[in-house]
Swiss-Prot record:
Residues 301-388, 405-474 are annotated as: Disordered. The keyword Coiled coil applies. Gene3D superfamilies: 1.10.287.1490. Belongs to the CCDC149 family. This is Coiled-coil domain-containing protein 149. Residues 1-199, 259-286, 385-414 form a coiled coil. Keywords: Coiled coil. InterPro entries: Coiled-coil_dom-contain_pr_149 (IPR019179). The keyword Transcription does not apply. The gene is CCDC149.
Length: 474
């Protein structure tokens, strides 16, 4: 390449001398102009050629630099290994980016640490507040237990009290409605008795005159096949049939009212059962109750546990109640008598009139009696429950006295009707309502020994279980 440049230099020098000397045939002025034009063309060609050479040299320089960098990386890889390559060989701008990312990550870590510390402090405050609320609830439970004169080792559950209060309020409302219904029935029976007495005062009817209220036996006799077609088409028979239809219509209306009240009672009891199931589920989740016979069954009266570790659930009262009754027999008898009275009042006010049912001491009636004993849980007596019991006792007492007086008056005025009632037909008014269960009759007779002695034909004077007695019971 140096030789080529040298030869090129010699040729250019020769051409320059020829141009300077010029063509001797031309005049001096023209010779000078021709030399300048030739020099301009030559310089342009030379510049163009040099520009191409510069581009070629720059391209070769880039290739050589890339080869050099690759060679250096290969040498460093052979000396230091693969791990050190990524650490050592970074460009300047890449290192700056990495440093900036590291700084941002440090700032985020610091902010997260501050947030974590704030969350820990807030959690500590919440724990302290929770402990204060727990202490407050425990003090309130103790105060409530002291107010209600409960046992200090068995704190009363406030939720159970609220649930019981709601249930008793619903039952009280239902009892008021049933009392109004029974009052209307008593008024109707009074009117029937008055009509019967008026008809007897005017004179005896010819044969089978009806007075508006019939017994089941009279209805069966009137509608039997033997006598149904033989009724004469007289005004008396038409009046009897009208009275029969009216009595049956009134009975159907009463039964519809009873069914409606029974549905409302079932709804209230269903809500009560749902609340109790929810309470039991809560106790089961918390570990205070499990299915009987299971591995996790908890015995609240386990003597192996110390008194401080025993559960303070309200269910403990149901377990320890029998032992307390055995320890004090007098108090147990008094409490049993009060429970029987409240049970009788509850049955008298809540149970609908069992019209048309046979007076059989069935298991259903026994279960109702047992259910009445468990009607009041082993919680302190609430004022609403006492009001219900006192109201029921007053109503029962008034209805007993009134019915007894009316019954004696009717028997004095109509001795013939009492003799007829011994054979089976019903007196005016109430036999169509059917019989009461024997448990109700027994409780009623036990509460009225004096009235029973003065009226020995009490059970016979009112056939079909005594409709008046059903009225007295309610």
């Amino acid at each position: 390449m140096a030789n080529q440049l040298r030869e090129r230099h010699q040729s250019l020098k020769k051409k320059y001398r020829e141009l300077i000397d010029g063509d001797p045939s031309l005049p001096p002025e023209k010779r000078k102009q021709a030399n300048l034009a030739q020099l301009l063309r030559d310089s342009q060609d030379r510049n163009k050629h040099l520009g191409e050479e510069i581009k070629e040299l720059q391209q070769r320089l880039g290739e050589v630099q890339g080869d050099n960098k690759l060679l250096r990386m290969t040498i460093a890889k052979q000396r230091l290994g693969d791990e050190a390559i990524g650490v050592r060989h970074f460009a300047a701008h890449e290192r700056e980016d990495l440093v900036q990312q590291l700084e941002r990550a440090k700032e985020q870590i610091e902010s997260l640490e501050h947030d974590l510390q704030a969350s820990v402090d807030e959690l500590q405050d919440v724990k302290e507040e929770r402990s204060s609320y727990q202490d407050k609830v425990e003090r309130l439970n103790q105060e409530l237990n002291h107010i209600l004169s409960g046992h200090e080792n068995r704190i009363i559950d406030v939720d159970a009290l609220c649930m019981e209060n709601r249930y008793l309020q619903e039952r009280l409302k239902q009892l008021h409605e049933e009392v109004n219904l029974l009052k209307s029935n008593i008024a109707k029976y009074k009117n029937a008795l008055e009509r019967r007495k008026n008809s007897k005062g005017q004179g005896k009817s010819s044969s089978s005159a009806l007075t508006g209220v019939l017994s089941a036996k009279q209805v069966q006799d009137l509608l039997s096949e033997d006598h149904g077609c033989s009724l004469p088409a007289t005004p008396q028979s038409i009046s009897d049939l009208k009275s029969l239809a009216t009595a049956l219509l009134e009975t159907i209306h009463e039964k519809n009212m009873v069914i409606q009240h029974q549905r409302q009672t079932n709804k209230i009891l269903g809500n009560r059962v749902a609340e109790l199931e929810k309470k039991l589920r809560t106790l089961e989740v918390s570990g205070l109750w499990s299915l009987p016979g299971g591995k996790d069954t908890i015995l609240f009266s386990d003597p192996t546990l110390p008194s401080g570790q025993r559960s303070r659930s309200p269910l403990l009262k149901f377990v320890e109640q029998p032992t307390e009754n055995k320890a004090d027999p007098k108090d147990g008898e008094a409490q049993k008598q009060e429970e029987d009275e409240s049970c009788a009042a509850a049955e008298a006010l809540t149970a609908p009139e069992d019209a048309g049912r046979p007076a059989v001491n069935s298991p259903a009636n026994q279960s109702r009696g047992n259910q009445c004993k468990l009607f009041h849980p082993s919680l302190p007596q609430l004022p609403s429950e006492e009001e219900v019991n006192s109201l029921g006792r007053e109503i029962i007492k008034l209805t007993k006295e009134q019915a007894a007086a009316e019954l004696e008056e009717v028997r004095r005025e109509s001795p013939i009707e009492g003799q007829r009632s011994e054979t089976g037909p019903a007196p005016p008014g109430l036999a169509i309502q059917g019989e009461l269960p024997k448990s109700h009759l027994d409780s009623f007779e036990a509460s009225r020994p004096a009235a029973k002695a003065s009226t020995p034909e009490d059970g016979k004077g009112i056939p079909e279980g005594g409709g008046m007695r059903s009225t007295v019971k309610t």
